[in-house]
C-alpha cells in the first residue's frame, strides 16, 4: 500500500554520544531515515544529545532538539510537538530503551510506535519473553535461566552448570555481561549485570563457546514479505561478542542445505516477532545443529555493516516500511530500477575487523568476551577471502606485534584478545599447522586455510620473486611496499610487474542492473568498472575507523565538505574504510572508494582520473600525516592534482616544535618555554633547563597519545621510552607545564587574506587535561575583554603566518593575564561540529569553499554573539574497560561527546552532564576527598553544596578541613583503612556524587578503587576541582530554574 496519509509528523530518537558498543552507525541510519521520511512529505522532529552528528544538522530534519536523552525530557518534547508517530529503531539500544520507558510513562498515549511494535521490542529485549517465544515456535535456544536477584545463583549452578554466559536485558554491546567459569566470577558479573539492566534482569545461558556464530540481516514489511539482506559469519567462534569479532560476508562455511535451514529459521523468527523493518538475528551453529542466541529488533551495528557490504540501504527502506509502504513499492535507490523486495546479491567477499583502544589503554584487560571493548571497525572488500583479510589488516591502522615464541603464541591463540587475529599469521610463519591452530582457537579450518595461503604467498615471494608471483600476491591483497620488502625488489619495479589495480562496483545485484550511485573497491586481474567524465573532481580523504582521538567529528567535517563542494558544482569522491559512517553512505558523495587509507591506495585512486585536487584536512591526524608524502608522489608521477587548502609545509611547521617556536617568536606571541629532543639524554637536559613539571609528548600523533605531565627525572626517563616508541622518526616535544592556567580552544577559517573566528571555547577542566577530555563552554565565562582581544589577535596572526587556507584550531592557556599559545593545527578539529551547532556557522562547509578559491568576504559569515550558553561534555569508556586508570590527564580517553544548551551556564552544564550519563544529584550524599593543596578551594565548593541541601561525607583530612571552616561533614574510612568505607556506601546506593582528586601514589590507588565502584554502580564522579565548581553551579541553577526545552533553531534565531 502507499504510505499512510494519517502520519504527518514523526519523532525520531537518536542514539546519543559515541560509546563502546554504539558508534557512528546510528548517525548513518538516523540520517538516512530522516531523509527517507522527508522524501515522502513527512515532517521529522529529531532529538539527540550529540552535536557531532549529521542528523542534528538543520537540513536533515525539520525540527531538531539537542537535549539529554531522558524519557522525562522527551515526554515534554512530545507534549510540545505532538507527533503522530515515533520511530524508535534508528537510535540503537538507547532509542529502543527510551521508547519502552516512554510507553511505561504513558507519554505515548496519542503517539503510534511506527514499524516494529512495542510488544516486539519487549519480546526481543526481555530475555524471558524472548526465550518463551522461541520455545513456542519450536526454535532451539541454549539451556538457560532468568535471574532478577543475586540469591538465585545457587539454583542457576544446579540447573545450568558452569561455564555460563551472562546476558543482561536491555543493555548495549553486551554491557554488564560476560563469561563465568567459577562461582566467584558468576557472582561478580551478575551483580554488575543486574545493576546495568534497565529491568534488573539477566539471562544465564549454557555455554556454546566454540560453536560458529552466524548472523542474518532480515527485512520485513506489513504485507509479511521477508527478504534476507545479508548473511554474515564471525571468524571468531561463540564466546566473543560479534562486535569484537572479525566478520566475513557472505557466509562461506555452510552447505547449501544448512544455509537454507538458517535462512528459513530467520524468516520464521522475524514473523513470530512481528518486526516491521530491519532485524538482526544471531545463531550458534555446530555440525548441522543450531541455537538462537538473540535478536535485535532494530537497525544495529551489523545492519550498518550489512548495508555497506551489499549496498542495500537498510535504514532508508525500514523508515518507509514504518510509514506503511511495502517492499515491492519501494525503489532500491542504488540501482534506481529494482524494488527493495529483490534480495541483494554480491560477487565479492567482505571482511570487517574491529579497532580496539588498547594503544591508548595499555593497562586495560585485553581479553575479548561477550562484552564489547572496541571503539570502531574497518571494512575491506576483495574478490577472494585472502584479499579481504589483507586489505582489512592494512586498513586497521594500528601496530601489529610480531610473536615468535611458541609458548607465547599458544597462550594468545587459546585466550582471545585483540592480538589473536594477527598472531594466527605468526603461528603459520612459525610452522604451526591448521589442525593445531584450530584446536587452540576453535576457528573454522576453512578460514585458517585462507590465512595459511597468505603466509605461503609470503614465503613464495621470498624464494621466487618473479613477475608472476608478484601479480599473484597483488591479487591476494598485498601492498606494493610489502611485496618489495618480501622480494627485495624496488617498489617501482614491483608496481610495474603487478600493474595498477582496477576498481569494481558495489551495486546490490552482482552487476545484473546498472547502479546510479556507485561505490568501488580495488582488485587486480579483471576489468575496471569506473566510467570517467570531464567534470571537475576532488578526492576527500576520510578518517578511517573510529578510535579515541579521531571520532565521528571528522566524518562530520568530511560530509560537510562534500556538501559544500557539490553546491559549487564540483564532483566529489571519498576514500574511506569505515562502514559505520555517513560519509560511506551510498549517496553522500558522487563516488566512494572503500579502501585502506595508506599512501599507495590513495595514489592509485588519483591515477584513475584527472583530479583537480585532494583534501586531507578533514580526515584527522592520519589524513594530515599523508600530506607531504602524497605531494611527493603527485610530483613524481606528474599528476595534475593539488593538495587543496593549507600546504603540507604549513602542516609541518605546526607539527615541528622548533619551526613553530620560530614562527611564534617572529610574530611576538608568548608560548611556554619548550624544546624538542630525539633522545632520552637530550630530553633530560632540556627538561632540567626548562624546569619541572614539564609536558612530554610525541609529535605527529593523535589524541595526546603517550602524552604525560612529568615531575622529575625518574618519571621523565620512564615516559620517554613510550614517547620514543610511538613517534620513532619525529622528535619528542617538551613544554613547561602551566599549572592552574585556564585553557582555551579556538576554531577558525582562513582564506589567506582574512580570518573568520568560529568560536572561542573555555575549558572547564584544568590545564593538563587533554582538550578532547575537557568539558568546554561557548561563550567564555571568566575571561576579560582584553584577554579575548589578544586571543583573537594571536589567532589571526598565526593563521596568516602559517598561510592557512581552510580550518585551523589553536590551543591557548591564560595564566596571570598572560595569553600563551600552546599549539596550532591547520586542519579540522574535534570541536568543529560543537562550534558549528553552538553558533550556527557551518565551519567545515565554509572551509571547503575557501579551499577551492572562494573568499570569506563573499560568503557572508562573521563571528557571532548570542544569548545562549553551550557546553560540550565528554563520554568516558571506563564502564566498558576494566583496569583503565580513570584519572584525566594529557592523554585523551573519551570516546564521544554531548552538548547542553540553555540560557545560563549552570543549566547548560547540567544538561551536558545528564547527557554524558553523569547525572548530578539535587539531594542526597556527596563524598569529597581532595589533596592538602586543594583544601582551601574545596571549602568554597563544599559550603555551596551544603547550602544547596546536600549532605557531605569525606575522609579524615578533608573532613577536618571542612569542620575548621564550620562546614559539617561526616567521616568515612579510607579504602585501605578497611570497611565500612566509601566503596561500601556506593554499593549500598548511599552516595549520589563523588568528588575525588588524587595526587600521590596511595591516593591514586584509593581513587582507582573508588572510581571503579562508581563506574560499576552508575554514580557520577568528578576528578578535578574545576569540574566540581561547575557541578555546584549546575545544581544551584537547576534548583532555582527549570531547564529550557527549545529546538536548536530557536537559540540560533537570536544570534547576532
Swiss-Prot record:
Mn(2+) 4 binds at residues 823, 825. Residues 918-1056 form the MGS-like domain. Mn(2+) 1 binds at residues 282, 294. Mg(2+) 2 binds at residues 294, 296. It is an enzyme of class 6 (ligase). GO terms for biological process: 'de novo' UMP biosynthetic process; glutamine metabolic process; L-arginine biosynthetic process. SUPFAM superfamilies: Carbamoyl phosphate synthetase, large subunit connection domain, Glutathione synthetase ATP-binding domain-like, Methylglyoxal synthase-like, PreATP-grasp domain. Mn(2+) 2 binds at residues 294, 296. Binds 4 Mg(2+) or Mn(2+) ions per subunit. It holds the Pfam family MGS. GO terms for cellular component: cytoplasm. Signal peptide: none annotated. ATP 1 binds at residues 127, 167, 173-174, 206, 208, 213, 239-241, 282, 294. Residues 131-323, 661-852 form the ATP-grasp domain. Residues 531-919 are annotated as: Carbamoyl phosphate synthetic domain. It comes from the Archaea. InterPro entries: ATP-grasp, ATP_grasp_subdomain_1, CarbamoylP_synth_lsu, CarbamoylP_synth_lsu_oligo, CarbamoylP_synth_lsu_oligo_sf, CbamoylP_synth_lsu-like_ATP-bd, CbamoylP_synth_lsu_CPSase_dom, MGS-like_dom. The large subunit is composed of 2 ATP-grasp domains that are involved in binding the 2 ATP molecules needed for carbamoyl phosphate synthesis. The N-terminal ATP-grasp domain (referred to as the carboxyphosphate synthetic component) catalyzes the ATP-dependent phosphorylation of hydrogencarbonate to carboxyphosphate and the subsequent nucleophilic attack by ammonia to form a carbamate intermediate. PANTHER family: CARBAMOYL-PHOSPHATE SYNTHASE [AMMONIA], MITOCHONDRIAL, CARBAMOYLTRANSFERASE FAMILY MEMBER. Large subunit of the glutamine-dependent carbamoyl phosphate synthetase (CPSase). CPSase catalyzes the formation of carbamoyl phosphate from the ammonia moiety of glutamine, carbonate, and phosphate donated by ATP, constituting the first step of 2 biosynthetic pathways, one leading to arginine and/or urea and the other to pyrimidine nucleotides. This is Carbamoyl phosphate synthase large chain.
Amino acid at each position: 500500500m502507499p504510505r499512510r496519509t494519517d502520519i504527518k509528523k514523526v519523532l525520531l530518537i537518536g542514539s546519543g554520544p559515541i560509546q563502546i558498543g554504539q558508534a557512528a552507525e546510528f548517525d548513518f541510519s538516523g540520517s538516512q531515515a530522516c531523509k527517507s521520511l522527508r522524501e515522502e512529505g513527512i515532517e521529522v522532529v529529531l532529538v539527540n544529545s550529540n552535536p557531532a552528528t549529521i542528523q542534528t544538522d538543520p537540513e536533515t530534519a525539520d525540527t531538531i532538539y539537542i537535549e539529554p536523552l531522558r524519557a522525562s525530557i522527551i515526554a515534554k518534547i512530545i507534549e510540545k510537538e505532538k507527533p503522530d508517530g515515533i520511530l524508535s529503531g534508528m537510535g540503537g539500544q538507547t532509542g529502543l530503551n527510551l521508547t519502552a520507558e516512554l510507553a511505561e510513562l504513558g507519554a505515548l498515549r496519542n503517539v503510534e510506535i511506527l514499524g516494529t511494535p512495542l510488544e516486539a521490542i519487549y519480546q526481543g529485549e526481555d530475555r524471558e519473553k524472548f526465550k518463551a517465544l522461541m520455545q513456542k515456535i519450536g526454535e532451539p535456544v541454549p539451556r538457560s535461566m532468568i535471574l532478577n536477584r543475586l540469591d538465585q545463583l545457587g539454583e542457576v549452578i544446579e540447573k545450568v552448570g558452569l561455564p555460563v554466559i551472562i546476558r543482561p536485558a536491555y543493555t548495549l554491546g553486551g554491557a554488564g555481561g560476560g563469561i563465568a567459569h567459577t562461582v566467584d566470577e558468576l557472582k561478580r558479573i551478575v551483580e554488575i549485570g543486574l545493576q546495568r539492566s534497565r529491568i534488573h534482569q539477566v539471562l544465564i545461558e549454557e555455554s556454546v563457546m566454540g560453536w560458529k556464530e552466524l548472523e542474518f540481516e532480515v527485512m520485513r514489511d506489513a504485507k509479511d514479505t521477508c527478504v534476507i539482506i545479508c548473511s554474515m559469519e564471525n571468524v571468531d567462534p561463540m564466546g566473543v561478542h560479534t562486535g569484537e569479532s572479525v566478520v566475513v560476508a557472505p557466509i562461506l562455511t555452510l552447505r547449501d542445505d544448512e544455509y537454507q535451514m538458517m535462512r528459513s529459521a530467520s524468516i520464521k523468527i522475524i514473523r513470530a516477532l512481528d518486526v516491521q523493518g530491519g532485524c538482526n538475528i544471531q545463531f550458534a551453529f555446530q555440525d548441522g545443529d543450531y541455537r538462537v542466541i538473540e535478536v535485535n529488533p532494530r537497525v544495529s551495528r551489523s545492519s550498518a555493516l550489512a548495508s555497506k557490504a551489499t549496498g542495500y540501504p537498510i535504514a532508508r527502506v525500514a523508515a518507509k516500511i514504518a510509514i506503511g509502504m511495502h517492499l515491492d513499492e519501494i525503489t532500491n535507490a542504488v540501482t534506481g530500477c529494482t524494488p527493495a523486495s529483490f534480495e541483494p546479491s554480491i560477487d565479492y567477499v567482505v571482511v570487517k575487523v574491529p579497532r580496539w583502544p588498547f594503544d591508548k589503554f595499555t593497562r586495560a584487560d585485553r581479553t575479548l568476551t561477550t562484552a564489547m571493548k572496541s571503539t570502531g571497525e574497518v571494512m575491506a572488500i576483495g574478490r577472494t577471502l585472502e584479499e579481504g583479510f589483507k586489505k582489512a589488516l592494512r586498513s586497521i591502522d594500528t601496530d601489529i606485534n610480531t610473536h615468535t615464541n611458541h609458548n607465547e603464541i599458544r597462550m594468545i591463540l587459546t585466550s582471545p584478545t585483540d592480538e589473536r587475529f594477527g598472531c594466527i599469521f605468526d603461528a603459520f610463519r612459525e610452522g604451526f599447522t591448521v589442525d593445531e591452530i584450530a584446536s587452540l582457537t576453535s576457528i573454522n579450518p576453512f578460514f585458517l586455510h585462507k590465512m595459511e595461503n597468505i603466509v605461503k604467498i609470503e614465503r613464495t615471494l621470498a624464494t621466487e620473486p618473479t613477475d608472476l608471483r608478484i601479480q599473484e600476491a597483488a591479487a591476494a591483497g598485498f601492498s606494493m611496499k610489502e611485496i618489495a620488502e618480501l622480494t627485495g625488489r624496488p617498489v617501482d619495479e614491483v608496481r610495474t610487474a603487478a600493474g595498477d589495480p582496477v576498481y569494481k562496483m558495489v551495486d546490490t545485484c552482482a552487476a545484473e542492473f546498472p547502479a546510479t550511485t556507485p561505490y568501488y573497491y580495488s582488485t587486480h586481474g579483471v576489468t575496471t568498472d569506473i566510467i570517467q567524465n570531464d567534470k571537475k573532481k576532488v578526492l576527500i580523504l576520510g578518517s578511517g575507523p573510529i578510535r579515541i582521538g579521531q571520532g565521528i567529528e571528522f566524518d562530520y567535517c568530511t560530509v560537510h565538505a562534500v556538501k559544500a563542494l557539490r553546491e559549487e558544482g564540483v564532483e566529489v569522491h571519498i576514500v574511506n574504510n569505515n562502514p559505520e559512517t555517513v560519509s560511506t553512505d551510498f549517496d553522500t558523495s558522487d563516488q566512494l572508494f572503500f579502501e585502506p587509507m595508506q599512501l599507495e591506495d590513495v595514489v592509485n585512486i588519483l591515477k584513475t582520473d584527472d583530479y583537480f585536487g585532494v583534501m586531507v584536512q578533514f580526515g584527522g591526524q592520519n589524513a594530515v600525516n599523508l600530506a607531504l608524502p602524497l605531494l611527493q608522489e603527485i610530483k613524481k608521477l606528474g599528476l595534475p592534482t593539488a593538495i587543496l587548502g593549507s600546504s603540507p609545509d604549513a602542516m609541518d611547521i605546526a607539527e615541528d616544535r622548533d619551526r613553530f617556536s620560530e614562527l611564534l617568536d617572529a610574530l611576538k606571541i608568548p608560548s611556554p618555554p619548550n624544546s624538542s629532543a630525539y633522545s632520552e639524554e637530550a630530553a633530560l637536559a632540556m627538561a632540567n633547563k626548562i624546569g619541572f613539571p614539564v609536558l612530554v609528548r610525541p609529535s605527529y600523533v593523535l589524541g595526546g597519545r603517550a602524552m604525560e605531565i612529568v615531575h622529575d627525572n625518574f618519571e621523565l626517563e620512564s615516559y620517554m621510552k613510550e614517547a620514543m616508541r610511538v613517534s620513532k622518526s619525529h622528535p619528542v616535544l617538551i613544554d613547561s607545564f602551566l599549572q592552574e592556567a585556564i585553557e582555551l580552544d579556538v576554531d577558525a577559517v582562513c582564506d589567506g587574506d582574512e580570518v573568520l573566528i568560529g568560536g572561542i571555547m573555555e575549558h572547564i577542566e584544568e590545564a593538563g587535561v587533554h582538550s578532547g577530555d575537557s568539558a568546554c563552554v561557548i561563550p567564555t565565562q571568566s575571561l576579560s575583554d582584553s584577554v579575548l582581544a589578544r586571543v583573537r589577535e594571536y589567532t589571526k596572526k598565526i593563521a596568516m603566518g602559517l598561510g592557512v587556507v581552510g580550518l585551523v584550531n589553536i590551543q591557548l592557556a591564560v595564566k596571570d593575564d598572560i595569553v600563551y599559545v600552546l599549539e596550532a593545527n591547520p586542519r579540522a578539529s574535534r570541536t568543529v561540529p560543537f562550534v558549528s551547532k553552538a553558533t550556527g556557522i557551518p565551519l567545515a562547509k565554509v572551509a571547503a569553499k575557501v579551499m577551492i578559491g572562494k573568499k570569506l568576504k563573499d560568503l557572508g559569515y562573521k563571528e557571532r554573539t548570542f544569548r545562549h550558553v553551550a557546553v560540550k561534555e565528554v563520554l568516558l569508556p571506563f564502564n566498558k574497560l576494566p583496569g583503565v586508570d580513570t584519572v584525566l590527564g594529557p592523554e585523551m580517553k573519551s570516546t564521544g561527546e554531548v552538548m547542553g544548551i540553555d540560557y545560563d551556564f549552570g543549566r547548560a552544564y547540567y544538561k551536558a552532564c545528564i547527557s554524558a550519563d553523569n547525572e548530578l544529584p539535587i539531594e542526597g550524599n556527596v563524598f569529597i576527598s581532595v589533596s592538602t593543596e586543594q583544601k582551601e578551594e574545596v571549602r568554597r565548593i563544599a559550603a555551596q553544596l551544603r547550602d544547596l541541601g546536600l549532605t557531605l561525607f569525606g575522609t579524615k583530612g578533608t573532613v577536618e578541613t571542612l569542620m575548621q571552616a564550620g562546614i559539617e561533614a561526616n567521616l568515612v574510612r579510607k579504602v585501605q583503612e578497611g570497611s565500612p568505607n566509601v566503596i561500601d556506601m556506593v554499593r549500598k546506593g548511599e552516595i549520589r556524587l563523588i568528588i575525588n582528586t588524587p595526587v600521590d601514589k596511595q591516593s591514586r590507588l584509593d581513587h582507582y578503587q573508588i572510581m571503579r565502584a562508581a563506574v560499576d554502580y552508575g554514580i557520577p564522579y568528578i576528578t578535578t576541582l574545576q569540574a566540581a565548581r561547575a557541578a555546584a553551579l549546575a545544581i544551584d541553577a537547576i534548583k532555582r530554574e527549570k531547564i529550557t526545552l527549545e529546538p536548536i533553531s530557536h537559540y540560533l534565531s537570536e544570534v547576532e
